[in-house]
Structure formats: C-alpha cells, structure tokens
Amino acid sequence: MLSRGWFHRDLSGPDAETLLKGRGVPGSFLARPSRKNQGDFSLSVRVDDQVTHIRIQNSGDFYDLYGGEKFATSTELVEYYTQQQGILQDRDGTIIHLKYPLNCSDPTSERWYHGHMSGGQAESLLQAKGEPWTFLVRESLSQPGDFVLSVLNDQPKAAPGSPLRVTHIKVMCEGGRYTVGGSETFDSLTDLVEHFKKTGIEEASGAFVYLRQPYYATRVNAADIENRVLELNKKQESEDTAKAGFWEEFESLQKQEAKNLHQRLEGQRPENKSKNRYKNILPFDHSRVILQGRDSNIPGSDYINANYVKNQLLGPDENSKTYIASQGCLDATVNDFWQMAWQENTRVIVMTTREVEKGRNKCVPYWPEVGTQRVYGLYSVTNCKEHDTAEYKLRTLQISPLDNGDLVREIWHYQYLSWPDHGVPSEPGGVLSFLDQINQRQESLPHAGPIIVHCSAGIGRTGTIIVIDMLMESVSTKGLDCDIDIQKTIQMVRAQRSGMVQTEAQYKFIYVAIAQFIETTKKKLEIIQSQRGQESEYGNITYPPALRSAHAKASRTSSKHKEEVYENVHSKNKKEEKVKKQRSADKEKNKGSLKRNISLTPCRGLRWADRDL
C-alpha cells in the first residue's frame, strides 16, 4: 500500500513542476489541493522530462478524474491508477505512468508518526502490543492533510477477554495549526502530542484518553533520514535504561528473528558439516544455491553454504539485481565456489574481509597469485592483474572450464580492506564509493549474473553491504522522497538468509550510510539543477533505461506562470466536440500551460474503503 506522503498541502502548480523535475524521475507523482476549485485536488505526474497535471474531482460523494472510475477516497483513486498501469493515456497513445510517489516531508521527525496507515492496521499493531495507553499518529485517509491519533485504551473492546479498545481521534490542520477540536491549537503535531501527554484527552463521554507509551515506526521519508538518525541517537527518558533508539529498533528486529522458521536440512546433513565454516550458520533450503551437474547419487554433492537474496520490496519491473550471500571459502569448498560462480554467470565478486584478521582465518585465498593460473576442480582461474586503492583491492580474473579452454569469462574481484577487525568503519564514505564502483561495473555487463557477496560467515558484513546497496537502489529507482524502512528491509533479507546484519553497530551503520548517500545526492542534484538544460540524472541516481526512452516523441511544454495547469481528462466515450471546446477554452485561458488530452481506458475500479476511524 502506498504512503499518503504524496499529498502536499501547500504546493502550487509551478512549484509542483519544479519539485518533480528536480527531485523526481519519470513516473514520479504527487497530489495537492486545487487552487481553483475548493475541495478538488490536482495530480501532478512527471512524464519524461515534463510534468502533466490532472484534476481530481471531489463531488462530495466520490472522487474521480472527471470521468472514469469513481472511488470513496483519494487514496483508493491513486492506488488504483498506480496498480492499473496503462489506464491513463493521451489521445496520441502516450501512457501516463503513476509509479513513484514523490512524498512531502513528514510533519514531524518523532518516531510515533507512522504516515500512511488504516484504522484497522493501527488497531492490529496497538492490540498486539497490549500495553494500555500506547499511541501512534497516522495520516487521515478520509481527509488529506489531516491526521489521526490512535490510542489503546485500558478497557476491552467488547466482552471481558476481548482485545482492548482502540480510540481514534481526528487531528485537524487548519491554517497551519493543529487541533483535536475546541479552542486549543498548536504550532506542530509534536506540540499537540506533548501537551496531551501531560493532560490527557477528554472524550465526549467524560472519560479520559492518556498518551503514555509511543508506538514507534521504522518507516521514514528518505529525504528526512538525517532527522531520524538524530532522533535514534537520543537516549530514552528513563535514566536507568539509557539506551538510544538504535538499540530499541535492533532489539525489536532480533525478537522477530524467531518468525523465520525456514528449514535448513541440507546444511545439517552429516556429509555437509565439513563444508560449513560455522556449524550453526546454515543456508535456508528454500533459497539456497544448488550446484548443478552433480551426481544425485552422492548425498550433499550439490551443497554450498550460500543463498540467493533479492530485494522483494521492489516490484519485478523496478529491480533486476540479485545477490548471492555466501560464507567465506574453506579449503574444502573452493572448487564448489568456482562452480557456483561459473553456473550463475557471476562477473562481480565482493569480499568484505581480509583472509586473516586478528590471527583468525576468515577466508582461504580462492584465487591464484597475480600473473599466475591455477586449476580449481573443473575450472582454470587466472589472476590477470591487481589494482590497489586506499580502501580496496581490485583483481581482474579470468575463468574457463577445463573441457573448453576457448570459453573465457572475466570476473572482477573487489576486496574491501578497510573494515576494522571489530565494529564498523568510522564513516561510510569509503563503503559508498566502493559500492559505487561495484555497481558501475555490474551495470556495464548487461548479461551478468548475481553479484556474489561474502565475508567470513556470510551474514554480518555481507548483510550490511547488501542492505545498504538495496536501499541505495530503492532511492535511485523511486527518487529522494520515497519511503524507506531499514528494519523492514533487514527482515526481508533475513527471510532469505538467516542472521543477516548481526550487530547494533552494523544496524546503525546502515542508517548513517544511507543518510550520507542521500545528503550527497541532494548536493549533486542542486549542482545539476543550477546548470541549465541538463537532465536530472546524477551520480548513483539514474533513471531506469526503460523510463528514459519511453514516449521520447511526446512534445510537451510546462507552465511557468499559471497557478493551475491541467490535463483535460475524458472518458473514451466522451464526444470529440466536447474535447475541442475544452481545448479552445484552455488555449485562451492558460497560454503556456501543458495541454494534452488524456483518455481513460474503461476499466472497473476498486470499491473497497479503507477505514479512517
């Protein structure tokens, strides 16, 4: 479900264009109040390098695009058109994609703010917590720009023994001030919550609702992550447990690890025990890499301690990158490692450990000395050259099967050497630059297979590197103002390989790395936007090739002066005469505005309504 962060309360048409061109990618969109028709809204969408504006009608009974399907809430309308790609299109057939919400900044950096959430979802979270007077704040689904304070009471919902009742209190934003009704208004959501934490809120019945224990969110608008890092660094109010928010989030993550009950039977086989560096760090069966071409009559012959890992939080059309998370090689597994690299067509290997650290063997060298060649099982590997940088060593290797020496593949081996023996790097710049080089290499090889990432156990540093790269890719794909959830991303990765991201320090390092990545990206954007005529494509943030080239022939002009800039939205069964009249009227009224006729492909819409209690 999309976050409602795409609704921008105080944004004009020209400002929306500037924002979408400067911070969005093709397919980015946002919604804003109509400055022309009170109660209506405007949907602004980036199409190629221009911006299209579509009016959303609020009839009082339903929302629609002046034609097409009708919906109970604006959220349902937007979700429908994001899920049903191809519904919105110009008369010339150009598709208008709603793909990536360009979210506004959260109204507060407080962690009790959860953004988009239905009443039912809030109830489930609070009732599962089970502590009376736990509260959270979320977006209003029925009234864009307003909010809801959801609080778990100390009385059951119905009969004794039933779940505790949840009270939902509407928080209205009027004239830039916040109120729950009555004469009291506040400058910010934070001020409102802090006030009622002290006084409680009196219901119409005379009973009081108290705000005692916040239910913290882990979701955050990517552009606001620096503020979230500051919040997580704060100590708890209780002096006897002076733990920062990072500790809280990581402990919560650890408690959820028990939910990953996937089997690991192959790694437990007696014949495979010698292939595991650590006897209890084993691959899940459902996602393990299976060595091909092995004798099925030999138990365990297809086993290697490695798992496929994919970013399942991105859609199939948004992400093509797959990783293999593997343990560091043992003497007994080097041949299997090269078998895996060959069968998966891997061209990039990422090693995040030294061979020996603090006198302990972390990974046996599975490559030959520079300028030499060596046979590993069924494959010959040559170390063609090595290049040293301040942070890492790059080896250029060649691999070929012994039975076909003419078939040669080049593999780039990146070994990160600046990770300390204990803890994490003191700053993330080196890791970000390292990943930038890796991604440039992988992207230059269009048919390359998964990137193999390993450390020693294949879960701590390996998980940290993979999660950072996934989050960078999410921001690169969806734009700087997308929602990210680091805890949820780690949960998703842990469901594919157990124990990924091992320590609180690694957890915090991910936050700090993504914060620096986003800050650097913002600065690059500012520089590029100041250079007239250049496309908004910067650093690691690149547009998906399919989106870059889509509808390249569409000719569009943008409004620079008009407050309201709209597409004319018509259903396909509308008469052309009406369209021509609208075109003529717009031509006189909004010179310089974007004037394209949008047709709605007839399709039945969703008819459910999300609760906003």
From Swiss-Prot:
Protein name in UniProt: Tyrosine-protein phosphatase non-receptor type 6
SH2 domain: residues covered: 6-102, 112-215
Cellular localisation: Cytoplasm; Nucleus
Region described as Disordered: 549-598
Domain remark in the UniProt entry: The N-terminal SH2 domain functions as an auto-inhibitory domain, blocking the catalytic domain in the ligand-free close conformation.
PTM info: Phosphorylated on tyrosine residues. Binding of KITLG/SCF to KIT increases tyrosine phosphorylation. Phosphorylation at Tyr-566 by LYN enhances phosphatase activity. Phosphorylation at Thr-396 by TAOK3 leads to polyubiquitination and subsequent proteasomal degradation. Ubiquitinated after phosphorylation by TAOK3. Ubiquitinated by a cooperation between ITCH and WWP2 via 'Lys-27'-mediated polyubiquitin chains resulting in the reduction of its association with LCK.
Signal peptide: none
Entry keyword Ligase: no
